[in-house]
């Protein structure tokens, strides 16, 4: 029987190969890890690592896929695209900036860790320009409900800079 990490790696490889097979597709990749510099709202002793791909296909689809490990077993986490590099500590990428912190205006993905602290998921989102300084952040808590009184997803526990056609 294949171990979950091997299955996740195969799934990510299958996803990447299938998505990049179409001519004109753009692929951005990020390897996420712990922050190394203390900053407000950042956890520096995280053991979370992840691999992420954003694929913009020639037919107009944009898909984000994240595979992570080192999460708390059974935990739920928010993943967001952020403006700038990890060391810039900027806010969430928004289609209409400044705007509402909603699934429709930002790139959100939910990760739910299994008993071994691993998670993998993907989401199709509205197209956005991959040829700009962006990073991918895993937050300590799941995505909040939207609307009045919605809370933030907590501190940042892992980050990786998106690199186009990496």
Regions found by a protein language model. Name each.
Residues 2-166:
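N-terminal leader/targeting pre-sequences
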